[in-house]
């Protein structure tokens, strides 16, 4: 019985160590285009005639550059707040890079402080271009800082102050 308990504990320990340590060695590159709006040709409406076209009304509202917090939690690249046909997004450009880690989320901050509960979405990847829709009712002018935050340990990885 002791051998079974010991084996189970070893397996759990291996899994936990892998979950904590593997992100430091594994990069996930994302390459998202700007969001698109779906349009439907009303003359020939059918389930097969839906077309997607790139949106022409893109407005850049704010921009900032990511910085890390220490040697273990580094970040770089461009963050933007953009508006496309009335919807507001955070856009991480192609040059975005952050140290990978467990349970990373994109959130908001103000005056150098992370706003708890402001998570927009789980970080899609630690490198490359990606989009995150701001919640409806959020004034894009009020977005001051974008944070990459480790929710499991309440640790900041990177932030961008937006101007």
Enumerate the language-model features and the residues they cover.
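Short proline/glycine- and polar residue-rich coil/turn motifs
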Residues: 122-128
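A short beta-turn/strand-edge loop motif at beta-sheet boundaries
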Residues: 96-100
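Hydrophobic membrane-insertion alpha-helices, especially the h-region
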Residues: 5-19
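Beta-strand signatures of extracellular beta-sandwich domains
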Residues: 105-107
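Transition segment at domain starts
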Residues: 21-85
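Surface-exposed loop/edge segments in extracytoplasmic proteins
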Residues: 113-120
